[in-house]
Amino acid sequence: MPPREEMIAVGETKVQVVIGGQGDPLVVLHGAGGNRGWRRWMAAVAERYTVYAPTHPGFGRSDAADWMESIDDLARFYLWFLDVMGLSKVHLLGHSIGGWTAAELATMRPGAIDRLVLVSPTGLKPDEGEIRDIFFYPPEELLQYTVHDPATVPEWAELFGQKPGPAEIEIALRNREMTARLTWKPYMFNPRLPHFLPRVPNPTLIVWGREDQIVPVICGEQYRRLLPNATLRVLERCGHLPPIEQPDVFANLVLDFLGRA
């Protein structure tokens, strides 16, 4: 079944959601770059699961949410989203700030989800090094730190090969502004999260790129230690975007992990 787009009202906030596939529900929470649409890895996973990919409030074409001030708020919003959609015991996957959101949600209501996939998540202060300040760089330069080797990215031309037009620039600025609103002070982590992660009993797959220059791979080790039932997979020759950089490998990891449910 081809994917479709819907605008879903969660309270007074309407969010854009891409839905496709068949089978048990998998909710996908995007990172700071915004919802990149129906990607190659999603199409592979959607052969066995129904994928729900919402665009966060304040991002893309979703409504603004000026009341929202933290990733905690975003996690609570997505608990409400699950209720509105009538979804229970979903598999939950999040990338970068979406991974942080997924982790926070899991600490709030672990019974709402079945299996958890965290992909290069922010949310923890690195024991060594630091999370790169993504607001310091112009988009073109930031992309150099985000992807390890553009030549190996199958969808590079489609995603990044064209100079953005006015509409794309406006969305990028909107995404950037909302990311700053949600993740600033302290930058990209919640000092309370480490104390709540041990509450999450759900089987968890953590995926990281060995060459991630945005969030140090040591954060993956920290998540693995704090989550009682977690496995960490580190992909070689991969940066901060495993689903985009190695879509087939990533899709197979996800399918194998979810298939154990």
Model region roles, listed by residue range:
Residues 166-195, 199:
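Hydrophobic, aromatic-rich cap/lid helix
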Residues 200, 206-208:
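Short beta-strand/loop motif that positions the catalytic acidic residue
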Residues 11-61:
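Conserved HGGG/HGGXW glycine-rich cap/lid loop of the alpha/beta-hydrolase fold
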Residues 103-108, 113-145:
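Flexible "cap/lid" loop of the alpha/beta hydrolase fold
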Residues 94, 98, 102:
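Gly/Ala-rich beta-loop-alpha elbow adjacent to hydrolase catalytic centers
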